[in-house]
Amino acid sequence: MDQLIQLVEATQPGVECPALNPGDTVRIQLRVIEGEKERLQAFEGVVISDRGAGASKTITVRKISHGVGVERIIPVNSPNIESVTVLKHGKARRSKLFYLRKRTGKAALKVKERKVSEQA
């Protein structure tokens, strides 16, 4: 059974995706099809959870839109993802940041920033 799963995952086209960790602020460009038109829609928020591995990996991204919390579960290997950009690297001490759901206002998106050294 494991060999079958590995075989299927090997044939999946992988999207170039940076390392995403809980606490990171990301902007994801998604392809949205409305009728016959296709456009890009940006979803920017904090990664509060990641789940799974390989082709079935998903992340949960949360943002505040007009005072209302919006969460979206996004499969990392989805063909509808155009690009993923990490805006800030957050320093989280938990693997799931569900406690951000209880916070309101700016505190709902506040995660300490992590310094990342970029090597050329």
UniProtKB/Swiss-Prot annotation:
Pfam families xrefs: Ribosomal_L19
Listed GO CC annotations: cytosolic large ribosomal subunit
GO biological process, one term: translation
GO molecular function: structural constituent of ribosome
Top-level taxonomic group: Bacteria
Key word Cell inner membrane present: no
SUPFAM superfamilies: Translation proteins SH3-like domain
Alphabetical UniProt keywords: Ribonucleoprotein, Ribosomal protein
InterPro entries for this protein: Ribosomal_bL19 (IPR001857), Ribosomal_bL19_CS (IPR018257), Ribosomal_bL19_sf (IPR038657), Translation_prot_SH3-like_sf (IPR008991)
HAMAP family registered for this protein in UniProt: Ribosomal_bL19
Functional note: This protein is located at the 30S-50S ribosomal subunit interface and may play a role in the structure and function of the aminoacyl-tRNA binding site.
Annotated family: Belongs to the bacterial ribosomal protein bL19 family.
Name of the protein described by the UniProt record: Large ribosomal subunit protein bL19
Organism: Chlorobium luteolum (strain DSM 273 / BCRC 81028 / 2530) (Pelodictyon luteolum)
Highest classification ranks of the organism: Bacteria, Pseudomonadati, Chlorobiota, Chlorobiia, Chlorobiales
